[in-house]
């Protein structure tokens, strides 16, 4: 898988845990005995014909009006599952790691995810999670940071 090759070639510090297969980021948080705010979920959108990876915490949702402002266009919609499978051929559907740059995707991370010292994400499969420090993730993934998510705990 691209993610392990990239992390190993970058001499990244990370750990991998295995768990029963889960099909949601909140499910992974429960399996990993972690708060959902530490679990990064990538959401793939299509904007002006180009795919963009939006990374946010498991309990949060994309606020499309905010995202439209960030992207500078009203042409923003969720990518179709078939498109996502084509972009991430080495990943199980719905288990994409939050490293858009490995797939030539612009990556934008919600600023609320940045507040914590570590991050957990799916490793391309539904039964493995990668744990790493937030500083390492930011250094390797190089996401743009923006406010584009709805945060239920804050009401916005």
Q: Which residue ranges define each predicted feature?
A:
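Extended, low-hydrophobicity, polar/charged segments
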Residues: 1-156
